[in-house]
């Protein structure tokens, strides 16, 4: 609110709340590993969903978006495992993606005109290199168009979309 010129917020996945806590990205990696092994993933799903719910509770608002976030987390376990080079990236990107949805809702609940923007809508097209995506040159023109928005745009970081519509992440920590 203090800077009306700020039009974009790029969101990371929730990190550690304390030294004993787990980053959501690390929890998603664990979930992915259990899923591809055919192990029970219910505890992984619940932990991640509860982590987002804890954020809502701490921020003190009633979230309608939690239904969609819960579904997005559980739906990861319905994706095909075989011949899916982008499965790991899709799991990892869920941290940023769901956090962006939640932050956009929080902003709106605090009288800030805000909108979640998926990297696909933002035009963040990337190379098809799982875990090491590179932004394609044409993306910058599309991103420039977003500056015309009157809303604060909440965009998940860490990933883009390939030309064949696959979620593809940048290198972790990069």
Regions from the PLM with identified roles:
Residues 1-174:
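Nucleotide/pyrophosphate-binding catalytic subdomain
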């Amino acid at each position: 609110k203090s800077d009306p010129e700020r039009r974009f917020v790029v969101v990371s996945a929730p990190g550690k709340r304390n030294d004993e806590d787990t980053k959501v990205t690390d929890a998603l990696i664990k979930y992915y590993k259990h899923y591809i092994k055919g192990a029970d993933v219910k505890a992984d799903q619940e932990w991640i969903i509860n982590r987002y719910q804890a954020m809502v509770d701490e921020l003190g608002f009633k979230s309608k978006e939690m239904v969609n976030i819960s579904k997005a987390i559980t739906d990861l376990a319905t994706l095909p495992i075989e011949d899916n080079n982008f499965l790991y990236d899709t799991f990892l990107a869920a941290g940023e993606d769901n956090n962006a949805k939640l932050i956009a809702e929080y902003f709106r609940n605090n009288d800030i005109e805000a909108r979640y923007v998926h990297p696909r809508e933002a035009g963040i097209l990337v190379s098809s290199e799982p875990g090491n995506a590179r932004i394609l040159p044409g993306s910058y023109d599309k991103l420039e168009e977003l500056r015309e928005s009157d809303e604060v745009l909440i965009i998940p970081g860490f990933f883009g979309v390939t030309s064949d519509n696959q979620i593809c992440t940048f290198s972790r920590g990069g």
